[in-house]
């Protein structure tokens, strides 16, 4: 295994590794780099879904929909509940312990599309921004039809480090209210305007230190509804100011997909965006969420 750094100075590129055969020590190194550098890229892989989760499981506990599906199966669902249950079953790759999500418009053998199969951009976001139990890592694997599509990432550790000492002090005690509803849309214009799952009970700090001791900004600006203690107008002005700081090119990594690519990213101190893609009915990514439970820091 060889480790290089991308030309942007922070994204990690791992070469000369077959993740099917990766050992615990290699997983330890890769997991640690995800936490410290926020994005790790590994190319030229040929993995089954089970091999994907096997590697992710070397880094931490892999998220599964088993309990949620089992609870739904025990419940007398109304029509809306049945529709949601069927939708969730459709986004999951079969025979993977309900842990691998298909990101695609391609239909499964029962005619159900995967997650986020729309062609329009899926604008800047992170995993489960409104939930305290959120997994801190997202794995994306290019299964097929990925060429010509692009996903970009932001590193908020670097963005935080570039702040003045005065702004670091100002931001230290700021808390945010977050939420998201996919029914509201995916673009910057509408991403944060649907409101049925805003979480006012959990208000995370804007400045966050992750499990590796790296400090950055937890600031999912398109999933952010308000800043605690500010009115709507002041919140909007503040969010736009910080957003514009984060959207500087020097904090970004752009990935132009090829089949067999893996991108692993940390979800506290990073955001990602899928750009417009007209071939979502052919493009299939696998998405796995997990934590750092097996990594020693």
PLM region descriptions:
Residues 2-264, 268-297:
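Fe(II)/2-oxoglutarate oxygenase catalytic core
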């Amino acid at each position: 295994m060889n480790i290089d750094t991308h030309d942007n100075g922070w994204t990690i590129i791992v070469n000369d590794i077959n993740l099917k055969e990766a050992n615990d020590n290699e997983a330890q190194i890769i997991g640690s780099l995800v936490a410290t550098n926020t994005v790790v890229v590994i190319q030229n892989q040929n993995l089954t879904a089970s091999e994907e989760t096997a590697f992710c499981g070397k880094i931490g506990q892999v998220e599964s929909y088993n309990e949620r599906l089992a609870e739904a199966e025990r419940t007398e669902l109304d029509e809306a509940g049945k529709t949601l249950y069927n939708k969730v079953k459709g986004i999951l790759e079969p025979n993977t312990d309900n842990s691998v999500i298909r990101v695609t418009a391609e239909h499964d053998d029962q005619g159900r599309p995967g997650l986020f199969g729309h062609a329009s951009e899926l604008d800047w976001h992170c995993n489960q921004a409104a939930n305290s139990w959120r997994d801190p890592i997202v794995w994306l694997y290019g299964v097929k039809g990925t060429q010509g599509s692009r996903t970009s990432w932001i590193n908020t550790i670097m963005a935080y480090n570039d702040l003045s000492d005065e702004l670091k002090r100002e931001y230290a005690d700021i808390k945010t209210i977050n939420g998201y509803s996919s029914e509201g849309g995916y673009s910057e214009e509408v991403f944060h305007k649907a409101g049925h799952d805003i979480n006012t009970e959990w208000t995370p700090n804007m400045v966050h230190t992750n499990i590796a001791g790296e400090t950055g900004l937890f600031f999912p600006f398109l999933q952010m509804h308000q800043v605690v203690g500010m009115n709507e107008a002041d919140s909007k002005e503040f969010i736009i100011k910080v957003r514009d700081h984060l959207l500087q090119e020097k904090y970004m990594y752009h990935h132009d997909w090829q089949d067999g690519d893996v991108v692993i990213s940390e979800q506290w101190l990073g955001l990602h965006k899928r750009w417009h893609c007209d071939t979502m009915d052919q493009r299939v990514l696998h998405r796995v969420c997990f934590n750092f439970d097996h990594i020693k820091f």
